[in-house]
Amino acid sequence: MKQYLDLMRHVREHGTFKSDRTGTGTYSVFGYQMRFDLAEGFPLVTTKKCHLKSIIHELLWFLQGDTNIKYLKENGVRIWDEWADENGELGPVYGYQWRSWPAPNGESIDQIANLLAMIKKNPDSRRLIVSAWNPALVEQMALPPCHALFQFYVADGKLSCQLYQRSADIFLGVPFNIASYALLTLMVAQVCDLEPGEFIWSGGDCHLYANHLEQADLQLTREPLPLPTMKLNPEVKDLFAFRFEDFELVGYEAHPHIKAPVAV
């Protein structure tokens, strides 16, 4: 995961100090890209231990179209707790936009189901896109989508994915986002009878929070370790049928976890 450390180093060297919504302050650059060949291993950061359980459960939660944190809490995942209301609701966030984007005629659009159908029917399409950024509903969301749009691309029997992340919390958020969309790519590839290709991460406002600098500098002193392998249950051919038990991470070795505060 040298690519990730290079991003962190780039922001430490070239970032501009900016105020932000949380009042914490950030060091930020605009526009950055990282590429990960999924044949070389699963891109889970090794220079600090990452909580894969949270990544998998959150992705499954998105794919079910869920916007209440009940499922997450039942599975020991607390990453959305700070934004939920007293009933656990988050408003029309990722899962709602992915699976139930409201159409003008009162019906809803299942972007994920449409995406799968299009990959199978017309893999050369340039419209293999899912958007979570719905301007009409942004104000109703507990937190507007940071990872706002992703596109798939099929070539030579391989499926690649590019994510556009408008707001990138480099220390805490980005390692999760890379792993989550890399995993989604593996899952979609399996159910569409394709091989995984590349995951490409494109960031807009890429920032380190002012209270994450010490942690980032510590992480930059660590040498990346070999990437692990992610194994999926080969029997699963329906994207919405995947369960937590269908994933096995093999060979994950990482440096110790580095604690850092979340900016809310």
From Swiss-Prot:
Protein's UniProt keywords contain Cytoplasm: yes
GO cellular component: cytosol
GO molecular function, one term: thymidylate synthase activity
Short name of one Pfam family: Thymidylat_synt
Reaction catalyzed: dUMP + (6R)-5,10-methylene-5,6,7,8-tetrahydrofolate = 7,8-dihydrofolate + dTMP
Record localization: Cytoplasm
Keyword Cytoplasm assigned: yes
Gene Ontology biological-process annotations: dTMP biosynthetic process; dTTP biosynthetic process; methylation
Residues that coordinate or bind (6R)-5,10-methylene-5,6,7,8-tetrahydrofolate: H51, D169, A263
EC number of the protein: 2.1.1.45
Binding site for dUMP: R21, R126, R127, R166, S167, A168, D169, N177, H207, L208, Y209
Biological or metabolic pathway of the protein: Pyrimidine metabolism; dTTP biosynthesis
InterPro entries assigned to the protein according to its UniProt record, in alphabetical order: Thymidate_synth/dCMP_Mease (IPR045097), Thymidate_synth/dCMP_Mease_dom (IPR023451), Thymidate_synth/dCMP_Mease_sf (IPR036926), Thymidylate_synthase (IPR000398), Thymidylate_synthase_AS (IPR020940)
Annotated active site: C146 (nucleophile)
PROSITE patterns: THYMIDYLATE_SYNTHASE
Keywords: Cytoplasm, Methyltransferase, Nucleotide biosynthesis, Transferase
Protein purpose: Catalyzes the reductive methylation of 2'-deoxyuridine-5'-monophosphate (dUMP) to 2'-deoxythymidine-5'-monophosphate (dTMP) while utilizing 5,10-methylenetetrahydrofolate (mTHF) as the methyl donor and reductant in the reaction, yielding dihydrofolate (DHF) as a by-product. This enzymatic reaction provides an intracellular de novo source of dTMP, an essential precursor for DNA biosynthesis.
Assembly: Homodimer.
Family according to the record: Belongs to the thymidylate synthase family. Bacterial-type ThyA subfamily.
HAMAP family from the UniProt entry: Thymidy_synth_bact
Protein name: Thymidylate synthase
Organism: Stutzerimonas stutzeri (strain A1501)
